[in-house]
């Protein structure tokens, strides 16, 4: 299976938490890049219409790293039911996909490989 680019979309309740999660997953090389901005969300929750400010977060990674990234987002997320949506990238430039792949090779795999030398 070819390694392709994906975007994992989630929302967080604060800029501080979005930033902290972004730094953790980029440092762990679970994704190459994270973008986030403030949004207004209107949604139904337990029979009530909610109207809240949140931060939408776009995690850019590869199909091979997506499963581990999503598990880490779930682990770090404060919501009972976090939004975690995987979108496939299309028409991605070769240089961008190469960069994305190189920067999304999570450290655990690299450390195991280096430890075997």
Where is each model-derived feature located?
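Positively charged, small/polar-rich N-terminal and surface patches that mediate targeting and assembly
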Residues: 1-117
């Amino acid at each position: 299976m070819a390694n392709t680019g994906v975007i994992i979309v989630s929302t967080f309740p604060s800029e501080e938490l979005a930033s902290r999660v972004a730094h953790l997953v980029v440092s762990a090389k679970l994704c190459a890049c994270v973008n986030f901005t403030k949004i207004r969300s209107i949604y139904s929750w337990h029979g009530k219409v909610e109207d809240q400010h949140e931060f939408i977060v776009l995690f850019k990674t590869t199909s091979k790293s997506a499963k581990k990234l999503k598990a880490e987002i779930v682990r770090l997320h404060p919501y009972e039911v976090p939004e975690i949506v995987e979108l496939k990238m299309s028409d991605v430039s070769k240089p961008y996909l190469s960069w994305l792949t190189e920067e999304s090779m999570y450290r655990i795999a690299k450390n195991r490989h280096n430890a075997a030398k």
